[in-house]
Amino acid sequence: MTAVESRPAGVALTPSPGAHRPSGARVKAFVALTKPRIIELLLITTVPVMFLAAQGVPDLWLVLTTTIGGYLSAGGANALNMYIDRDIDALMDRTSQRPLVTGMVTPRECLAFGIALAVISTVWFGLLVNWLSAALALGALLFYVVVYTMLLKRRTSQNIVWGGIAGCMPVLIGWSAVTNELSWAAVILFAVIFFWTPPHYWPLSMKVKDDYARVGVPMLPVVATNRVVAKQIVLYSWVMVAVSLLLTPLGYTGWFYTAVALLSGGAWLWEAHGLQNRAKAGVTGAKLKEMRLFHWSITYVSLLFLAVAVDPFLR
């Protein structure tokens, strides 16, 4: 039985004919399709990299156009993701209030909205930023929608590892927006986000693994024990912190960034090893405290990239 066939009675993916959908609520629903909270994290990595690339304050008009373009591109990717995943979203508690599940937006509207944002964002980047940034943004969108959502998500426990590449692209976009080229600094920060993504997302997946198991999505916490997942989190965390420290010896950052990277990275490793110790001890449920690392991961990436932006002014 497929996820769609097993959908509980009363859960609709499209509104009933004549369903009342207030215009204000409809606007909010279309905004929700873009997943604004996820996009906040993407922009946290984009704008600071522009400061590093400019070695100071970048052109503010360029920052604005890049930010808007990034929102449109990521929003389009997220809308298309919701269109593709609408069957399993209806079965998961965490996603049960998404616009396609509640019927506030129809699948056809969502698909058209996502495609429109993809086209508009690509043209926006090309005309107002540069075509390298446009190509990177389009590549990120296609990778997220096709490679992650369509090919990896429902097939492999390594889905978030390789699918996370799309979430690394804003770093490259921010750098290319300023310089119209890429450099090792951008590649290093890309790698930081690449190794950050699994230990950021797996703790959340541990919390909601029953949701994923119900719809047959093989997230690592679904197919492996907490002990195995925690070990993987620790391994990725150590690599992430090590990679974050490469910027300074290569001459891209100075003492301030290094201090923040060491302190925040040390705190991250403390939390990661704490989770591993609890998992080894067989702790389950609320006492596992896996969400502590999830929340800290957001603080960590915010602090690290704030340091990326501030460091050029202190050298």
Swiss-Prot record:
It comes from Streptomyces griseus subsp. griseus (strain JCM 4626 / CBS 651.72 / NBRC 13350 / KCC S-0626 / ISP 5235). Converts heme B (protoheme IX) to heme O by substitution of the vinyl group on carbon 2 of heme B porphyrin ring with a hydroxyethyl farnesyl side group. This is Protoheme IX farnesyltransferase. The lineage of its organism: Bacteria, Bacillati, Actinomycetota, Actinomycetes, Kitasatosporales. Residues 1-22 are annotated as: Disordered. Pathway: Porphyrin-containing compound metabolism; heme O biosynthesis; heme O from protoheme: step 1/1. NCBIfam families: cyoE_ctaB, PRK04375.1-2. Its EC number is 2.5.1.141. Belongs to the UbiA prenyltransferase family. Protoheme IX farnesyltransferase subfamily. Gene3D superfamilies: UbiA prenyltransferase. The keyword Transmembrane applies. It is a multi-pass membrane protein. GO terms for biological process: heme O biosynthetic process. It catalyses: heme b + (2E,6E)-farnesyl diphosphate + H2O = Fe(II)-heme o + diphosphate.
